[in-house]
Amino acid sequence: YYSDWYPINYLHQKVTKSSLDFVYPTDLGLKFKEVNLEAKTKTEVTDGITTNTWQVEDLEVLTPSYDQEKLPKLLLAPVKFSIGEFQGEMNDWAGLGMWQSKLNAGRGQLPEDFQQQILQMIQDLDTPYEKIEVLYEYLQRNFRYVSIQLGIGGWQTMTAQEVLENKYGDCKALTNLMKSMLEVAGIPSFYTLVYAGVDEEDIEVDLPSNQFNHVILQVPTDSGPIGLECTSTLNPPGYLGDFTSNRHVLVTTPEGGYLTKTPAYQEDHWNKILTETNVT
């Protein structure tokens, strides 16, 4: 994926002129979005190679009090792309969601003995929420967050079997395991991409591209979707916290992907989370 372009990089520095030449094979395609950017542009195509040029002049000097939402920037993304042997297109969010789903296909199988263990844990429970709660708490008690990303591992999850054996995984791996556990319980759920971080800006919803850095699990219910932060050992099911709340996320399915938004939490509606820790 492509880096964004920020023509202003430092505080108290005058930018008299800055330009970007972006050269790419024409058949890959290019999507872009100019944000607060008034640039002179030029496009040239020669022998199947396209060069797009943006040039800005006499930009405002940044100070510490500068409104970051007014910062000029250029967002870039390919239409066609490949990572490893997996090719995809980002004409729309559905295309990116389908690519992510294909990337993780076949990596959720659980051994028969563990499937039986799951069924035993939920055999006396009546409602889907009760089953979600028990399995989520099992995940929180027995697995820990460790991020190891080799090769395509920055995008593709570890297998559920590997997480079971190692007792750890990153956000992708823990989410994939939780999804697989719920599937055994007969509860559908969706691997969901999000740009996480406290007080982070929302993604650009009109530029379908990989703007994400984290994964959560979304579980549809009759009363609305439940979000599971599978790297947390404390959150109750359905509570995401300010790390991923109130922002657009990409829900992925084998048929494609679609955007939805995580809940916003108002201070006067907050619940307390009380924990008791014994250290010996």
Predicted regions and their residues:
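Extracytoplasmic
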Residues: V15-K17, I49, F212-H214, N246-R247, ...
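Active-site-proximal structural scaffolding
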Residues: Q13-K14, P111, P128, I132, ...
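Secretory-pathway-linked proteins and extracytosolic
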Residues: Y1-I148, T280
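Active-site-adjacent structural elements in folded domains
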Residues: K102, I122, V146-L150, M158, ...
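Hydrophobic/aromatic-rich core segments of domains that either
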Residues: A173-A264
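Long, His/Glu/Asp-enriched segments that create or flank divalent metal/ion-associated functional microenvironments
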Residues: L259-A264, D268-V279
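Short, conserved helix/loop micro-motifs enriched in His/Cys and acidic residues
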Residues: E112-Q116, R144-K167, G197
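Active-site-proximal cofactor/substrate-binding loop regions of enzyme domains
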Residues: I132-V134, Y138-Q140, M158-G169, L174-S189
